[in-house]
Amino acid sequence: MIEVENLYFDYTDFKGEKIELLKDISFKIESKERVVLLGVNGSGKSTLLKILNALVFPKRGSYIYKGMRIRKRGFKKISRSFRKDISFLMQDPNMLLFNATVREEIEFGLREFGFDDIEKRVEETAKRFGLEKYLETPPFYLSGGEKQRVALASLVAIEPEVLLMDEPSANLDPPTTEWLMDLLRELDITTVISTHNLALAQKFGDRALVLSDNHTLLFDGLLKEFLKNEELMGEAKLLHRYG
């Protein structure tokens, strides 16, 4: 479903120096896999998620989705179907909330992609996410965790095939995090999450992609095998987070 091969990403800073964020990254993700993306701050996790969502494009290497090479040139022709297929929940939910009410947030994607029975779908989605009493509320009045629910509800409502999530538990209390994990298992779609929370990672998925602090792919395999390998954990600088 997703194939990344020899992918590089860099940018030039204000001093004219090249800053490398991803170097020679290769992996494949099959349909309905649940993958945890691990690594210290600055290792390139958020950048990789942005590439998978085509918010930025590789400088070298390839990103292939369903047999289509995803690159800047020609992306406009496939952007509509791609945006319907792949949803991205950013760490800051405010980046996804721009409508007057929670109802309008959930409606937006449904209208954009031509769904039928929009009102019914909004009501069902609101109930699923515990948002019924907030439907007429402006999102900016809500707490961080509630905003996260609204943003996720608006993405799930359009029935994506792939869900990307950057630190999804950052604004959530433990009970809501447990609810989120249950929801993701129930959705049964391809899901990739980045997280620093190794306890959450173990509850979420079996497979891990681990980025090193020099922006390469350090590990691709079973999460339980990575967590048992103290040498790799130390190299990833994640050993202190597990215990």
Question: What are these model-predicted stretches?
Answer:
Residues 195-196:
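H-loop/switch region of ABC-family ATPase nucleotide-binding domains
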Residues 215-239:
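Conserved beta-strand-loop-alpha-helix hinge in the C-terminal portion
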Residues 163-166:
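Catalytic Walker B motif of ABC-type/P-loop ATPase nucleotide-binding domains
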Residues 117-134:
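Conserved ABC ATPase "signature" region
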Residues 61-72, 82:
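Conserved ABC transporter NBD signature motif
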Residues 53:
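Helix-to-loop junction immediately C-terminal to a conserved catalytic motif
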Residues 138-142, 146:
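Conserved ABC ATPase signature
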